[in-house]
Amino acid sequence: METQLLREQAIFPSKEVLRDALGNVYPVLEDLETRLSENEFALTFEWHYYKDSKGWLCKVCHKKKTIFWLSVWDGFFKTSFFFLERHLEGIAALNIAENSFVIEKEWGKMIPLVFNISSQKQISDLLKVIGFKKVSK
């Protein structure tokens, strides 16, 4: 069963806390954050505690646009994108492995696309979706 971590409001998810929580998956997150913070993507990572979900979530943004949400789980981190139905054709054209993500039940008009990231091999598909989300309207 999947267990979400980072539930304590008083404990901010610093690099040390993330390293302890993710173990050998932490270098994957660290590399992703470095790559996404650089000029090509220029994304920012904003950690906030959300009382409704009772946990820390990271909102990853380009300027004011939310690109994806990141949460930390036991053995992996989860990236959740929210798309409209009109974006599905563009996502299908990205040529990403079908087993690398899950499209979850619609949430209002939004369709969640979720990656459970546990290895560096998954990052190339994730970067394709990030690039698509960044330019989609």
Per-segment meaning from a language model:
Residues E2-L5, L36-S37, T66-K78, L113-I117:
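Charged, low-complexity, helix/coiled-coil-prone segments
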